[in-house]
Amino acid sequence: MPICDPSSSSTGAGSTKLWIIHGVAVVAAAALALGAHYYMFYRRSGEFRSRVVGIIPARFASSRFEGKPLVNILGKPMIQRTWERAKMATSLDHIVVATDDEKIADCCRGFGADVVMTSDLCRNGTERCNEALSKLDKRYDVVVNIQGDEPLIEPEIIDGIVKALQAAPDAVFSTAVTSLKPEDARDPNRVKCVVDNHGYAIYFSRGLIPFNKSGNVNPQFPYLLHLGIQSYDTKFLNIYPELPPTPLQLEEDLEQLKVLENGYKMKIVPMQVIKVEHEAHGVEVPEDVDKIENYMRERNLH
């Protein structure tokens, strides 16, 4: 129904109704303009998405590597090494470990970390971050999901994805990629990513993407490896658990595909991807522990 009907009378109840509707439209427009003014003010003043918490989700019952957060890496539990690296990031106002396991909680409290106990019903790290966020006393604008199996995570990567999200008001999710090593091309535990010309994620896969018709790895192509860290706008994080699981997410067992497949990238809020130069050293399976310890010894990292 149009706001202004040419056949409407200019007097009486019809006129009153017309002016009320017109008044509502004017007030709504003014509210939008005022909101935009404050939005731009916060962007310029550096207060947009300014309160940031880092959450390290950790569970004991991993199907591929049970007890992984507590595995010893050169004298320290892996979860402690991840926490110590995260503490070096300048963008985080607070860091907590989110877990459903008392052994992990006791270990983390022992080296000084704040711990939030979460349900054992969380289906992935993102849902665990959301539950932990709801239990924190302070309110935050951005949550950084720091994977507990990245004991050598670079603080610059954490700061980089936070800045990417702060600089992209149309995005609700940011993550990072790096160059894929040829030897990791066929490894399903190394998640690959393809990105559009504007720096937004197109797809993630455990298989090699893109895949050429020869079936061989092209040594000239810049394949990308997804790093196990991501940040979310907290408003989006609150609705993430309510998004229905998707076929691609379930087939690949990759939670970020639920965001893309539910249409956020294409229609409303794309997933921002930043590329960083980083030699990834995540621990997915027990065999990775020796690799990372050798890497640390070679570079005198303790």
Please report, for each region that a protein language model flagged, where it lies by residue:
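Terminal signal-anchor or tail-anchor transmembrane helices
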Residues: C4-R44
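N-terminal glycine-rich phosphate-binding loop and ensuing alpha1 helix
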Residues: S45-A98
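Hydrophobic/aromatic residues located in beta-strands of well-ordered beta-sheets
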Residues: G54, I95-V97, V143, S174, ...
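Short, high-confidence coil segments that cap the C-terminus of an alpha-helix
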Residues: L92, K138-Y140, A168-A171, Y264
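Short phosphate-binding loop-to-helix
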Residues: V96, E102-K163
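Conserved alpha/beta core of the MobA/IspD/sugar-nucleotide pyrophosphorylase nucleotidyltransferase superfamily
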Residues: K138, N218-H302
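Conserved core of the sugar-phosphate nucleotidyltransferase
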Residues: I153-T246
